[in-house]
Amino acid sequence: IKENIKRDLKKYAVAGIVPEILDLKYLYLEVTSNIYYNTNQAPSVSEVATVVQSNIESYADSSELNKYGARFKYSKFLKIVDDSHEAITSNITSVAMRRDVRAALNTLAEYQIGFGNQFHIARMSGYNIRSSAFRVAGITQNVYIGDIPNTNRENGSLFLFTLDNPASRNPTIVRRNVGRIDYIKGIITLNPINIQSTQKVIDGQSVIQVVATPQSNDVIGLQDLYLQLDVNSSVFEVITDSIASGLDPSASSYTVSSSYNYNRGLLVKP
């Protein structure tokens, strides 16, 4: 399709200028939002959830996103959630960034994955980034990409690891020094690697999804990155505010949500 468009554009091009069609590079946002509500002000949890979902989808489709140079405004997003229904008392929301990397199967290839935003380092012990599963030459199990920061907290190295299942917290590192990571510039570089298959196939393309936590929750679609909010990959949970609802005036059994639920407790991207 791209070549056909280029041929058509040549008919109208100024002499000496060759039109170039660039593939879109998407930077996806995934949010995890715990939304508290007063049960006395809403007939059901489903009503609150439906209204929130609708408002977030409208924001995801708006012109504030879906373009180069777009900025996800964290405080505005929180307000959209809070204002969705009068019963909502607050929300705790964390943000993650994702790139979908097309894999060149059965060939030795290097991959540079730019996010255009600084990465947050939650653990100096590693596992700050997450990936979906894939297979590489020489290893019979699914592998995932992990990172370990250097002491300067500016860059680090990449490794491959395996898990018995995606929910496991007991990784086995099977190959070290397979690439490097620049936390400041938000760039992940995989050394030449032979990828044989990927767990995820999107629109007929073998894809590795790579997820990182931004240093700032205001995420920018920098330069050639087209910013989108992936509602389908986000998680919205509506929770009873037991204090506001009068069920627990002393707050002794109040459900507290972490503001740092970056990876949803997982080492990998399911």
Question: Can you annotate each of these PLM segments?
Answer:
Residues 146-170:
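Surface-exposed intrinsically disordered loops and tails
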Residues 166-270:
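Surface-exposed interaction regions enriched in Ser/Thr/Asp/Glu
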Residues 22, 47-138, 145:
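An aromatic-glycine-centered, glycine-rich loop/turn in mixed alpha/beta architecture
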Residues 35-39, 115-117, 212-214:
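Flexible glycine-/small-residue-rich
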